[in-house]
Amino acid sequence: MTILVEHFVPDSRVDEKKVIEERDNELVLDGGFVVPKSKETDAFDAPDMNFLGHSFRDYENGESERQQGVEEFYRMQHIHQTYDFVKKMRKEYGKLNKMEMSIWECCELLNNVVDESDPDLDEPQIQHLLQTAEAIRRDYPDEDWLHLTALIHDLGKVLLLPEFGGLPQWAVVGDTFPVGCTFDSANIHHKYFKGNHDINNPKYNTKNGVYTEGCGLDNVLMSWGHDDYMYLVAKKNGTTLPHAGLFIIRYHSFYPLHKAGAYTHLMNDEDRDDLKWLHVFNKYDLYSKSKVLVDVEQVKPYYISLINKYFPAKLKW
């Protein structure tokens, strides 16, 4: 993201003109959050680099200690995320017996979480949620369900906290993928799947595995993590978000699908319709990560109103 920095220029008029030109090329949202603006479309424009100076989702820059940690994360994830593991976790966490709290209380609780799988983010989680939501809100002002979906899409990361069992990072964050069928080569660090027990199981190591072509993603087990957990929380607590919102929540980390086009043989027509909204959402989810912070208290009343519209006051988690 672009951060305004005034450089010393002897002529103060030149300096003032430079700052004004920079501000004309940016969007300043309600919470004070600044995002780059496209001159062609007057809308959000994805930057080329993250705040660390690397390409977004750069998993090959092995010289960085941060990148090495991300690779080790995926090694562990690919080994341990099996079909049986996912079924076990869905059964346990589908009970929703860990806590009762509101959506906003969960947003605040999420500030205690660090996502070690993300090479682009080191700000508090609530900032990423609000940065994403505010950027979408500016470009899609009438789609309030999409604003709220952006706010809550990562709330399942509370699984990392002791109150929710303190699951290891590989069981909560990172890219997701179907289990019960072959691991597509589009998955990041695919080589580490060689340590996954399912790869040698004839039930699970074919293209369709335990599924049928066109069965629909609702019928597919995804690797366990914050996406699927928040999807279960929203559904079982009776959210009135449209199906596209639930689709975004469950599959926003499913990069092999929405970035590489893998696993499309499992989709049905409803999935294909919802995927269009996921593509919209992903641009903001990925590229709105910034060192420029949102004024939480300023935007809070708006998001509380959306929470009240689409969710009960208290949810079971």
Swiss-Prot record:
Its pathway is: Polyol metabolism; myo-inositol degradation into D-glucuronate; D-glucuronate from myo-inositol: step 1/1
Q: Which compartments does it reside in?
A: Cytoplasm
What GO annotations for molecular function exist for this entry? inositol oxygenase activity; iron ion binding
Null phenotype?
Answer: Incorporation of the inositol pathway-derived monosaccharides is strongly reduced in knockout AtMIOX2 seedling walls.
Residues reported in the UniProt entry to bind Fe cation 2: D154, H226, H252
Q: Which residues bind Fe cation 1?
A: H128, H153, D154, D285
**Official protein name in the record:** Inositol oxygenase 2
Q: What is the lineage of its organism?
A: Eukaryota, Viridiplantae, Streptophyta, Embryophyta, Tracheophyta
